[in-house]
């Protein structure tokens, strides 16, 4: 389960819901996944972990499109964080975990926390940002908005392929982040 192309299709289908300020509930997510995969989760064509990742990708697409504008429209980082919290509040929560996600320790950074980390890091356009366990790119998107160059690492094949779609100018590698200093 979980090839990148249908997950990108799902993410693109979810973006208009985010743009309209609508919550992505399980029914909307299931419908988008069934349309992209041509089957339900009960068929084994996709799993809920994939659906949650597609919703994360939709948030990243939103920030790719509107993140820099959102930052310019606010006078303080707290106001930007409030906007990020609103966006994250529209996304579904990860209520189901796959055995692979537990085994690979795939626990996504919540979008508001990623925004706080990015603010603390103070990404600039002359930075090269290494994300050793990039996941779907929830932290990397903030570095991209700042204009930084990206070196993204992700062990999971589907997530790595998603990163390639989302951050075409980034170097994407597949090292085991537990031994990335070797």
Question: For each predicted feature, which ranges?
Answer:
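Class I S-adenosyl-L-methionine-dependent methyltransferase catalytic core
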Residues: 1-182
């Amino acid at each position: 389960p979980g090839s990148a192309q249908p997950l990108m299709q799902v993410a693109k289908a979810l973006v208009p819901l985010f743009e309209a300020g609508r919550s992505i509930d399980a029914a909307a997510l299931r419908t988008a996944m069934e349309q992209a995969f041509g089957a339900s989760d009960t068929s084994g064509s996709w799993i809920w972990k994939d659906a949650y990742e597609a919703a994360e990708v939709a948030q990243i697409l939103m920030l790719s499109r509107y993140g820099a504008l959102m930052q310019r429209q606010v006078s303080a980082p707290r106001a930007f964080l409030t906007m990020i919290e609103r966006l994250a509040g529209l996304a579904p929560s990860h209520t189901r975990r796959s055995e692979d996600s537990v085994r690979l320790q795939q626990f996504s950074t919540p979008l508001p926390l990623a925004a706080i980390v990015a603010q603390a890091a103070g990404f600039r356009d002359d930075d090269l940002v290494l994300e050793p366990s990039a996941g779907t790119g929830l932290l990397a998107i903030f570095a991209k908005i700042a204009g930084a160059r990206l070196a993204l690492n992700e062990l999971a094949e589907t997530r790595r392929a998603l990163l390639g779609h989302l951050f075409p100018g980034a170097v994407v590698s597949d090292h085991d982040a537990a031994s990335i200093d070797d």
